[in-house]
UniProtKB/Swiss-Prot annotation:
GO terms for molecular function: calcium ion binding. It is found in: Secreted. This is EF-hand calcium-binding domain-containing protein 1. Ca(2+) binds at D128, D130, D132, E134, E139. Component of the acid-soluble organic matrix of calcified layers of the shell (at protein level). Keywords: Calcium, Metal-binding, Secreted, Signal. CDD domains: EFh (cd00051). Residues 115-150 form the EF-hand domain. Its main location: secreted. GO terms for cellular component: extracellular region. Residues 1-21 form the signal peptide.
Amino acid sequence: MKVSLLLLALVLVCLVQGSESWRLRRTLRRIGRGIRRVGRVVKNVACNHACPRLCRQGVCKLACNLGCRGKRDVTQQLNQQGHVTPIPNSFAAYDMNEDGIISRKELALAIGEDIAHPDFMKAYSIADVDGDGELSPKEFYNGPYVFEMDLNDDDLAYCRYRLDIDDDLIDVIEGELVNQAPNFIEGNQVKETGKPHEIISKTGQPETKPIDKYVKLAEKTKTQ
């Protein structure tokens, strides 16, 4: 089909002379760009809707694995038994009893998969890094699941776990180490007492109110 169209276009270009030939080439280029745009739309729709459920084997499955988004290493681990299904990135959608973890039964029920299916079991075992039979948020978001990037409140949690930003992260702000985690200071003391986080200055001495130095500087400037 494509070869026939190319031959037809070549014949038309040869028959048309001068400016008409230039206009025809420009028209053909526009048509080509339009076809590519339509192809991208079809690809996006097929990958999000058709591939996860319909492309299980044969040519269709091959096209999905090559054209749709997914993790190549995970696809290889699954031994090419099925396409990785894009699912919503909302952890709460799968944590049905709101206990902070996702069980195998909860996940299977949420995505409509057979809990005993080999592909489902393999993907779940890959995600369950600590082997306790349950998925924490970090295990879930770093697992072999392809997530739909819908804009919602859970995108922050998704990005946080994908970037491996954990609760004990220490940021460097203007040469000072800022502790962001309550557990950094004597276990849960800060969380239990409600005291503010400490700032570790360059001198190694903690400052409970780092803003004070800026207030004092402003007052000193006013008096001068």
